[in-house]
Amino acid sequence: MRIFSWNVNGLRAVVKKGFFDWLESEGPDVVCLQEIKARTEDLDENILNPKGYHAFWNPAERKGYSGVAIFTKKKPVAVHLGLGIERFDCEGRVLRIEFKDFDLFSVYFPNGTSGEERLQYKMEFYDAFLDHCEELRGQGRELVITGDVNTAHKPIDLKNPKANQKNSGF
């Protein structure tokens, strides 16, 4: 199974730049998208239901912000939105689909760069997400986690490492 993950930084913008041509030519089994920045009621039918894929969405409540999606050729057994924690779920950061043998996540982790309060939110999100994963693993589930973690392990992980040295997540 070929699984692609992409922070699109605005789904409508990448659609205008040929996203569906790319999707058709590459033909991945699954595409996990982060930072879609669109609510489903604002999307055209061809985006909501891409040809050859089952599409699942977890947009943020706030228009033009955050949000994740998964397009999959194989229909999942179940779909789960969020972590079950409203202060995280309202930002549309987690989408999980269950297949018979594993669960697949598309996650857009908070970046925590806009002050101490948001950094605390980011760390609490990490804790809640890891607790959620441990609970699923305790139930015997295999997990595949994709997404934008907003944490860089090494300088090569950033476009501008020198400019980001003092930012959270690096």
Where are these regions (language model features)?
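Structured beta-strand-rich core segments of catalytic domains in phosphoester-bond hydrolases
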Residues: K37-R39, D44-G112
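Short, acidic/polar
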Residues: R12-S25
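Short catalytic/ligand-binding loop motif for oxyanion handling, primarily in non-cytosolic enzymes
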Residues: T40-D42, G64-Y65, T113-E116, A152-P161
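Metal-dependent phosphoesterases centered on the DNase I-like endonuclease/exonuclease/phosphatase
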Residues: K51-H54, D127-F170
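Active-site beta-strand/loop signature of hydrolases that rely on acidic residues for catalysis
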Residues: N7, L23-E41, L104, C133-P155
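Active-site-proximal beta-strand elements of phosphoester/diester hydrolases
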Residues: M1-N9, D101-T113, T146
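Soluble or luminal CAZymes and related metallo-dependent hydrolases
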Residues: V14-V15, D89, Y121-A128, F170
